[in-house]
Amino acid sequence: MQLNSTEISELIKKRIAQFDVVSEARNTGTIVSVSDGIIRIHGLSDVMQGEMIALPGNRYAMALNLERDSVGAVVMGPYADLAEGMEVQCTGRILEVPVGRGLLGRVVNTLGQPIDGKGEIDNDGFSPVEVIAPGVIDRRSVDQPVQTGYKAVDSMVPIGRGQRELIIGDRQTGKTALAIDAIINQRNSGIKCIYVAIGQKASTIANVVRKLEEHGALANTIVVAASASESAALQYLAPYAGCAMGEYFRDRGEDALIVYDDLSKQAVAYRQISLLLRRPPGREAYPGDVFYLHSRLLERASRVNEDYVEKFTKGEVKGKTGSLTALPIIETQAGDVSAFVPTNVISITDGQIFLESNLFNSGIRPAVNPGISVSRVGGSAQTKVIKKLAGGIRTALAQYRELAAFAQFASDLDDATRKQLSHGEKVTELLKQKQFAPLSVAEQAVILFAVEFGYLDDVELSKIASFETALLDYSNRNHAEFMQELNKTGNYNDEIKDTLKSILDGFKANSAW
């Protein structure tokens, strides 16, 4: 069969028209060294700071050092089988984690993957782990309380929604116990909770999860676990991942509480990464940006106004403010709060609860030192009844500590001093509280009323605990309606004062404890 030139021309044009060119521009590089979870990559000229780099075996690394002819990246997960010469490529994405209500009641790792064996998570989307904190115009002042259920905390160092309150102390002083009790106390308050465990033993994290489940608080809580066996990169990123999960609720006009346990271990993980990346070390071998490490995290905890929520939800949620309250934990060495990381975090937060090992060992638990524990913004968020009745507690304790030190050297004390010492001892005894036994606002109000108006004066020190138990039992049994109303409103006026007085008078007249 002979083809003429016209047919050949038509055939060529047809083939050209049907020819489909599929081209893909990929930014690739080659691993030149692998050491301690850090890879150095040649190439990747267009990589961004913090960008995810795709590695062989469906793994990722995060670009942290951008140098003239190489990139330093930290591997997210195991790196034993990575070798020189392997090809990697840019993804054009920064690290994102799943967010949404489907995470509540689940235990996830830093990347938001479930590790509790309960199947896949039904998330509402993804959010970048690094987000710029809301600006000044988007914020609203802190004026709503977060009740921890601890008399010592709610009366002397109150916490407000949107506040950052540091829990600081030596190891084994009850820092985690305080934070876990605060989470348990939110089970009926509507506040969603996130517990971020950084560098802890897996058995310790499992114990925390079990306790939350036992007390009915896990359904309201997301647990982000970066245990001691995880890589330094995952420990460094865990708080940011947890914060992104908490911001989901804040930005939709809800309230959330996040606990970082603890940021000392995160700083150590970041120091390890920085030294391996050969960044110049500073004080205590920490890198120069360790302050920024914590400040950019804790600034994201805030209370945002109605306009911000309405704008974020595109008008779906109106007239609601959102908040993310942070309880960062810092572990000190031998009570040294002037070390580098503790001073940094103290200066960033809105107050601190200082737990002292001497108090803890002498049986005062929670071991709150009222002298240097402070809440800078929580006072305006405190419920009226607690604010009114707790005014004299801190003063009484401060005077007691001062007199107790003086009384050690004085043999004969006048009656006024003896009375003050006795009162201080009773207040100290009354502020003791067992773990997993949070008190409601009304219960705290009844106890504080007894302190403020001298109902403890004729009670022996050894009987204080039984007096408190019997008083709460009497109040809840005989005045249940009043207690419920006080829990709801938190108000304080002459009528409430008279009712509290009648409760105490009736109890003292009729009860044996």
Swiss-Prot record:
InterPro entries reported in the protein's UniProt record: ATP_synth_asu-like_sf (IPR023366), ATP_synth_asu_C (IPR000793), ATP_synth_asu_C_sf (IPR038376), ATP_synth_F1_a_nt-bd_dom (IPR033732), ATP_synth_F1_asu (IPR005294), ATPase_a/bsu_AS (IPR020003), ATPase_F1/V1/A1_a/bsu_N (IPR004100), ATPase_F1/V1/A1_a/bsu_N_sf (IPR036121)
Pfam families according to UniProt: ATP-synt_ab (PF00006), ATP-synt_ab_C (PF00306), ATP-synt_ab_N (PF02874)
Ligand binding (ATP): G169, D170, R171, Q172, T173, G174, K175, T176
GO CC annotation, single: proton-transporting ATP synthase complex
Reaction(s) catalysed (UniProt annotation): ATP + H2O + 4 H(+)(in) = ADP + phosphate + 5 H(+)(out)
Its membrane topology: Peripheral membrane protein
Example GO molecular function: ADP binding
Gene3D superfamilies attached to this UniProt entry: 2.40.30.20, ATP synthase alpha/beta chain, C-terminal domain, P-loop containing nucleotide triphosphate hydrolases
Residues carrying the site annotation Required for activity: S373
Location relative to the cell: Cell inner membrane
Enzyme class: translocase
Main location group: membrane
Keyword terms of this UniProt record: ATP synthesis, ATP-binding, Cell inner membrane, Cell membrane, CF(1), Hydrogen ion transport, Ion transport, Membrane, Nucleotide-binding, Translocase, Transport
EC number from the UniProt entry: 7.1.2.2
Keyword Transport: yes
Functional note: Produces ATP from ADP in the presence of a proton gradient across the membrane. The alpha chain is a regulatory subunit.
Family named by the database record: Belongs to the ATPase alpha/beta chains family.
Subunit structure: F-type ATPases have 2 components, CF(1) - the catalytic core - and CF(0) - the membrane proton channel. CF(1) has five subunits: alpha(3), beta(3), gamma(1), delta(1), epsilon(1). CF(0) has three main subunits: a(1), b(2) and c(9-12). The alpha and beta chains form an alternating ring which encloses part of the gamma chain. CF(1) is attached to CF(0) by a central stalk formed by the gamma and epsilon chains, while a peripheral stalk is formed by the delta and b chains.
Name used for this protein in its record: ATP synthase subunit alpha
Record lineage: Bacteria, Pseudomonadati, Pseudomonadota, Gammaproteobacteria, Pasteurellales
